[in-house]
Amino acid sequence: VGKKANARLPYLCVDMGYSVRPDFTTVVHDQGFAPVMRYPVSRQTVWASEKPEFGSQSPGPVQINGAFYCPAALPLARQRRLVRRLNELLDEQDGFEAHDQALRKLLPLLMGTNSRPLKFVSKRKRSPETIPTYQIDLVCPAVQGRVKCPLKPESLIIAFDQPEVKPTWSAERYRCCSKSQIRHTYTSEQWKLAQWGMVPGSWEHAIYYEAARSLTEQRFSIMKSQHLSGREHLKWSPRREPMISVIIALWIAATNLAIQDSHVAKKPRPSSIKKQKRRLERDLGRPLMSTPPRT
């Protein structure tokens, strides 16, 4: 059954070894997934939009950890590294509290999205060597009522009780400030970091990532168990690719059957993601800061 055009894309959770590979984001996008990943500590994760040509406007949105924000969020991005392991926050004094407070300041400035990343190839320059560009429709957060901004006068009325943005520039400086919605073209560096599903740094992203990675390691341990999958190594088969491929396929099938049998035999258990969220909320004494709607 084909999925609807506007259905949520399935998540693909990978470790940092894949996220740094050339064209990784392009492959994930073209296969119809939304990446969920972290970045090496040494990697630059804050990128401004492309510098405008003389006399033209800059797009404005700044990319922070793979997601786009209002230009006013740039000073906040420099205060704290957000994409981190939960154990790191646990080891810090009031680490969960500090992280939640940082999200309460930053997430309202998240740009709205009226589309997924769209692949664009110029008709005039189309050739086998043509490198496609990727674009996305972004909406000012003040237009969506998540913040109030003097550059969007209507937001002062509609979002009177929301956090206030105090820009030090005029609306003509950025396209995202002079217009309500823009179509932004990713720069090459922005595209390498892009994540269009969960917002990196958010509680949802951190909890899901660690749960998915934990489940992956659990499945690998089952595959490595000779008692469950019946396979220990590939040394006894002809060292030819077709035969090895068949053995690996049977290995995975046997593992899947073992997982299914184990699942049927056990009683239903509560979601580990929900349990972790409740645990964090008990630690904070209040609900976690959640990612605001972007559409």
Q: Model segments located where?
A:
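Catalytic or ion-translocation cores adjacent to nucleophile or general acid/base/metal-coordination motifs
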Residues: 35-52
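Short, conserved catalytic/metal-binding motifs centered on acidic residues
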Residues: 9-20, 35, 216-220, 253
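A short acidic (Asp/Glu
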Residues: 20-28, 46-51
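Short, basic/hydrophobic alpha-helical segments
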Residues: 1-11, 24-25
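Basic, amphipathic alpha-helical segments enriched in Lys/Arg and hydrophobic/aromatic residues
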Residues: 208-291
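A short alpha/beta connector and helix-capping loop motif
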Residues: 23-40
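Long, low-complexity, polar/charged, intrinsically disordered or flexibly structured peripheral segments
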Residues: 116-199
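Short amphipathic alpha-helical "interface-anchor" segments enriched in bulky aromatics
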Residues: 53-139, 190-237
